[in-house]
Swiss-Prot record:
Superkingdom, taxonomy of origin: Bacteria
Marked site: Could be important to modulate the pK values of the two catalytic cysteine residues: H161, E210
Top-rank EC class of the record's enzyme: isomerase
PANTHER family referenced in this protein's UniProt entry, alphabetically: DIAMINOPIMELATE EPIMERASE (PTHR31689:SF0), DIAMINOPIMELATE EPIMERASE, CHLOROPLASTIC (PTHR31689)
Family under the similarity heading: Belongs to the diaminopimelate epimerase family.
Cited InterPro entries: DAP_epimerase_AS, DAP_epimerase_DapF
Protein name stated in the entry: Diaminopimelate epimerase
Designated gene of the protein: dapF
Pathway field: Amino-acid biosynthesis; L-lysine biosynthesis via DAP pathway; DL-2,6-diaminopimelate from LL-2,6-diaminopimelate: step 1/1
Main location: cytoplasm
Site location (Important for dimerization): Y270
Catalytic activity: (2S,6S)-2,6-diaminopimelate = meso-2,6-diaminopimelate
Function per UniProt: Catalyzes the stereoinversion of LL-2,6-diaminopimelate (L,L-DAP) to meso-diaminopimelate (meso-DAP), a precursor of L-lysine and an essential component of the bacterial peptidoglycan.
Amino acid sequence: MLLRFTKMHGLGNDFMVLDLVSQHAHIQPKHAKQWGDRHTGVGFDQLLIVEAPNNPEVDFRYRIFNADGSEVEQCGNGARCFARFVLDKRLTAKKRIRVETKSGIIVLDVQNDGQVSVDMGPPRFIPAEIPFVADAQALNYPLEVDGQLHSIAAVSMGNPHAVLRVDDVQTAPVHELGPKIENHPRFPQRVNAGFIQVIDRHRANLRVWERGAGETQACGTGACAAAVAAISQGWMDSPVSLDLPGGRLHIEWAGPGKPVMMTGPAVRVYEGQVRL
């Protein structure tokens, strides 16, 4: 059978989006891996699936697969594309959309200028909830990699993140250190690794090595986690503008227990069909 899909991106973080509200199919990890190949498939960082909700209090269910076939809990850039997609496809007429994910409910607001704001919910710092192996909760933790200690912040934005402060993101060892942090035994579900360079109280540069995808042009949850870590440690103040390789995201966070608000673009690239 043929399935209709839309290729989208948020700051270069690219997605294949499938509507399984008006189409019916059983998507398995092998499909994500097959379609995610940039040489022989569609090619993407993540596959986003729009489904009818299980919960009557939300509008849609949102599922995410990485290009390696692993299903993950959350994707911030994908959430913005999800909101733009369901409006463009007339699956809803609402500008404020409640969505069920593996890690909870998020709220998407589509603005008149085309930008999308996402209420990502409050960050979580308790090690067991990230999950991260630590004796006690702290603002930062020493993490040993290849005999060297690195100071990291550990945060969950519905998915696990490690955040490291660096002097210059251009020269940071993202491709060497990123996969080693991703697969570090202290992160039992693996982790996304963010490398942040603070410019001033409200601006920073960021690169993210994503769990199951490698370095991407932008990572929405990674930007949220980096902003939360920087504000928590006193390096920065809300609101924060983060420049990633693919462009800029705006993050607001009022402190512990408060939701993280992320605003950025969502772009449709093309429509296509793929054989299941």
